[in-house]
UniProtKB/Swiss-Prot annotation:
GO terms for biological process: flavin adenine dinucleotide biosynthetic process; riboflavin metabolic process; riboflavin transport. This is Solute carrier family 52, riboflavin transporter, member 2. Belongs to the riboflavin transporter family. The chain crosses the membrane at residues 14-34, 47-67, 79-99, 114-136, 147-167, 201-221, 282-302, 317-337, 344-364, 371-391, 409-429. Glycans are attached at residue 178. Residues 242-252 have a biased composition (Acidic residues). Pfam families: SLC52_ribofla_tr (PF06237). It catalyses: riboflavin(in) = riboflavin(out). The keyword Magnesium does not apply. One of its GO terms (molecular function) is 4-hydroxybutyrate receptor activity. Residues 230-268 are annotated as: Disordered.
Length: 450
């Protein structure tokens, strides 16, 4: 059969990437904007712990999607996807003018509008993992990697936008100790205004979410209507060591077909796809849950404690470069995909090595090793980049291996992602918000001197 035009193939990959970009860009945008809004909102630096809880509660979106599937079995997958996209667009659109609104709750001021809308966005983002991923079962594995590339952009673009905004600009004013004489000392930190406001930041996020929704509509025009749920495979098939070469050939062949024909080829039930709870499948899903528990729950909760002792610059470099490692890992997976379970677990141990180093720095905050040195800055930033890159590659490789099981496998992958993220967030809430396990420093104050 004749190969499709290259332009059509590239367009489909682009639309899938833009579609994936809208999955978590709202919550990621709120996270990177915290250094700006926290200066205005009454919760202060406890705001990240509030947001962690709200994102964990956002897993209720999983229950809402499950309820919808029970009440409307066999219905088109586009409806929950469009609802999720609509909630994200409306939520960020309302954040732009309302984020700074406060109200009295139990006699104390709270940022009710910001927290409420953050919860709505958390619901939509968490639901995206069990609505967006099953839709991709109608496409071959290379398009799934384009989707994860888009998810990487959902973390990278807000960080780039935040740097353009000027997040983290801080200077310490030196003044004489006694009038006009005496040695200079550091006093209150000076925060310079950003290049544009938080409201403008949220408007840009709204535009990006609108672009993602438009990309999904474009995919619906390119692809035929997906088959009803009853005709989908009911099991999870993962390749065995003896069929790796055949699997690679089967995976490569759909790229030579138009997206419409690919959908009908990939979505047909596989008579061998019946081992949903095989040991290999369980290992892959467990690995997916562990990596997401670390990257979405455990490590983000301590990122400020591990980085801020080395300065605002180290913190923002770790955020931006660590986020950029995500799409780079997706590019690597598109070229070289690890199909060995032992290899993936080996990579997981490598990622845990970097994660352990970062957790150690957070526990020793505000006086970790090499504080105040360039070597300390390089090590903490490099550790965040490598940790994020390794775990991102594991996520893409694991999901690609699960793809052969069709929609049920990708649905199970989405559940594993959210369950892991939920457990990680719950585990880190007491030590970061209740018990003084991690201690923060003060700007322009040397707490590590003799």
């Amino acid at each position: 059969m004749a190969a499709p035009p290259l332009g059509r193939l590239v367009l489909t990959h682009l639309l899938v990437a833009l579609f994936g970009m809208g999955s978590w860009i709202a919550v990621n945008g709120i996270w990177v904007e915290l250094p700006v809004v926290v200066k205005e909102l009454p919760e202060g630096w406890s705001l990240p712990s509030y947001l962690s809880v709200l994102v964990a509660l956002g897993n209720l979106g999983l229950l809402l999607v499950t309820l919808w599937r029970r009440l409307a079995p066999g219905k088109s997958e586009r409806i929950p996807i469009q609802v999720v996209q609509g909630l994200s667009i409306v939520g960020t659109g309302l954040l732009a003018p309302l984020w700074s609104n406060m109200a009295l709750v139990a006699g104390q001021l709270h940022s009710v509008a910001f927290l409420t809308l953050a919860f709505v966005l958390a619901l939509s983002c968490c639901a995206s993992n069990v609505t967006f991923l099953p839709f991709l079962s109608h496409l071959p594995p290379p398009f799934l990697r384009s989707f994860f590339l888009g998810q990487g952009l959902s973390a990278l673009l807000p960080c780039v936008l935040a740097l353009a905004q000027g997040v983290g600009r801080l200077e310490c004013l030196h003044v004489p100790a006694n009038g006009t004489t005496g040695p200079p000392i550091k006093v209150s930190p000076i925060n310079f205004p950003e290049r544009f406001s938080a409201g403008t930041f949220f408007w840009v996020l709204t535009a990006l979410l609108g672009t993602s929704a438009a990309a999904f509509q474009g995919l619906l025009l390119l692809l035929p209507s997906p088959p009803p749920e009853a005709t989908m495979g009911t099991g999870l098939r993962v390749e065995t060591p003896g069929t790796e070469e055949e699997e690679e050939e089967e995976e490569a062949s759909p790229l030579q077909e138009p997206p419409g024909q690919v959908a009908s080829i990939v979505s047909s039930p596989d008579p061998k796809a019946h081992r949903l709870f095989s040991s290999r499948s369980a290992c892959l899903l467990g690995l997916l849950a562990i990596t997401n528990a670390l990257t979405n729950g455990v490590l983000p909760a301590v990122q400020s404690f591990s980085c801020l002792p080395y300065g605002r610059l180290a913190y923002h470099l770790a955020v931006v470069l660590g986020s950029s490692a995500n799409p780079l890992a997706c590019f690597l997976a598109m070229a070289v995909l690890c199909r060995s379970l032992a290899g993936l677990y080996g990579l997981c141990l490598l990622g845990m090595f970097f994660g352990t180093y970062l957790m150690t720095l957070a526990v020793l905050s505000p006086c970790p090793p090499l504080v105040g040195t360039s070597a300390g800055v390089v090590l903490v930033v490099l550790s965040w980049v490598l940790c994020a890159g390794v775990f991102s590659y594991i996520k893409v490789a694991t999901s690609s291996m699960l793809h052969s099981g069709g929609r049920p496998a990708l649905l199970a992958a989405g559940v594993a992602i959210q369950v892991g993220s939920l457990l990680g967030a719950i585990a880190m809430f007491p030590p970061t918000s209740v018990y003084p396990v991690f201690r923060s420093g003060e700007d322009c104050v040397d707490q590590c001197g003799p």
